[in-house]
Swiss-Prot record:
<dbReference type="InterPro" id="IPR022973">
    <property type="entry name" value="Ribosomal_uL10_bac"/>
</dbReference>
<comment type="function">
    <text>Forms part of the ribosomal stalk, playing a central role in the interaction of the ribosome with GTP-bound translation factors.</text>
</comment>
<dbReference type="GO" id="GO:0070180">
    <property type="term" value="F:large ribosomal subunit rRNA binding"/>
</dbReference>
<keyword id="KW-0694">RNA-binding</keyword>
<dbReference type="InterPro" id="IPR002363">
    <property type="entry name" value="Ribosomal_uL10_CS_bac"/>
</dbReference>
<dbReference type="GO" id="GO:0006412">
    <property type="term" value="P:translation"/>
</dbReference>
<dbReference type="InterPro" id="IPR043141">
    <property type="entry name" value="Ribosomal_uL10-like_sf"/>
</dbReference>
<dbReference type="InterPro" id="IPR047865">
    <property type="entry name" value="Ribosomal_uL10_bac_type"/>
</dbReference>
<comment type="subunit">
    <text>Part of the ribosomal stalk of the 50S ribosomal subunit. The N-terminus interacts with L11 and the large rRNA to form the base of the stalk. The C-terminus forms an elongated spine to which L12 dimers bind in a sequential fashion forming a multimeric L10(L12)X complex.</text>
</comment>
<keyword id="KW-0699">rRNA-binding</keyword>
<keyword id="KW-0689">Ribosomal protein</keyword>
<comment type="similarity">
    <text>Belongs to the universal ribosomal protein uL10 family.</text>
</comment>
<dbReference type="GO" id="GO:0015934">
    <property type="term" value="C:large ribosomal subunit"/>
</dbReference>
<protein>
    <recommendedName>
        <fullName>Large ribosomal subunit protein uL10</fullName>
    </recommendedName>
</protein>
<dbReference type="GO" id="GO:0003735">
    <property type="term" value="F:structural constituent of ribosome"/>
</dbReference>
<keyword id="KW-0687">Ribonucleoprotein</keyword>
<dbReference type="Pfam" id="PF00466">
    <property type="entry name" value="Ribosomal_L10"/>
</dbReference>
Length: 166
């Protein structure tokens, strides 16, 4: 087998592994971004723990098929970049959506969230969600509210009995 074919097979395997392992994958069209804008986008994604790479569409199609995500192939036309996140589901959608608001050249095409294909509208909806830490803090405050109210009610009853006894 030729060296070129081996290299391409390694890339296909790499992409397929990333597709399987990532919790969130977003496909974007980066055509029209300047080098400085692309660098800024990569920096923001890196800070959010997201890997951002450009692959040949033919190799990405093969990887999507081997990862059983063939429905992603219809979005793999033109110059594409793919953002992979293995930790936070919301991070790539949030960073890319915010960047796309400021830079019209960046176009979000579709994504795969936890193995399910999502459209542009669904990616934008996911981008508006708070991060996992934000959701956990909201949950914690909801769980603490009844305990706090019970403590305040108990204190109020104790204060009232103290006033009556005095």
């Amino acid at each position: 087998m030729s060296k070129v074919i081996e290299t391409k097979q390694q890339v296909v395997t790499e992409i397929a592994d990333k597709l399987r392992a990532s919790k969130s994958t977003i496909v974007v069209d980066y055509r029209g971004l300047t080098v400085s804008e692309a660098t800024e986008l990569r920096k923001q994604l890196r800070e959010a723990g997201v890997e951002f790479k450009v692959y040949k569409n033919s190799l990405t199609r093969r990887a999507a098929e081997s990862a059983e995500m063939a429905e992603l192939n219809e979005f793999l036309t033109g110059p594409n970049a793919i953002a992979f996140s293995n930790e936070d589901v919301v991070a790539p959608a949030k960073v890319l959506n915010d960047f796309a608001k400021d830079h019209e050249a960046l176009e979000i095409k579709a994504g795969v969230i936890e193995g399910k294909l999502v459209t542009l509208d669904e990616v934008k909806a996911i981008a508006t969600l708070p991060s996992r830490e934000g959701l956990l803090s909201m949950l914690l405050s909801v769980l603490q509210a009844p305990i706090r109210n019970l403590a305040l009610a108990t204190k109020a009853v104790a204060d009232q009995k103290e006033e009556q006894g005095a």
